[in-house]
Regions:
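Mid-chain, well-packed structural core segment of small domains
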Residues: 46-47, 58-67
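Broad gene-expression machinery/nucleic-acid interaction feature
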Residues: 53, 57, 77
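Protruding loop/beta-arch "assembly-hinge" segments enriched in small, turn-prone residues
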Residues: 68-94
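Conserved short "hinge" loops at termini or chain/domain junctions
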Residues: 1-53, 85-94
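Short, structured secondary-structure boundary patches
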Residues: 41-42, 67-69
Length: 94
């Protein structure tokens, strides 16, 4: 996927203006892509929704790295987005 197309909105979402964490954030983006594909979702790098899904997942990984308990759980919005994306893919595959 276009890493910069995901990195810029991720940094905005996380309120990060410095480039100091770019390498770490790119690692989170790649991890998010891998985690999403293990759920059976085929990501399309040209699909804005898929890029946003990766960004949301990477933001969750960043935020949950220091949280414990309920705060480290995946947000419902993200779980629903993943489920909706997978169901949409399965329907289009027939």
């Amino acid at each position: 996927m276009g890493d910069n197309q995901i990195l810029v909105p991720l940094k905005i979402d996380l309120h990060i203006s410095s480039d100091a964490l770019d390498s770490y954030l790119l690692d989170l983006i790649h991890a998010a892509e891998e985690y999403i594909t293990t759920e059976g979702i085929t990501l399309d790098p040209n699909n804005f929704g898929d890029r946003l899904l990766v960004e949301m997942y990477a933001a969750h990984l960043y935020r949950s790295r220091r949280d414990t308990g309920d705060k480290s759980k995946m947000p419902r919005m993200l779980r629903w987005a993943l489920n909706n994306r997978l169901f949409s893919q399965k329907i289009s595959e027939g």
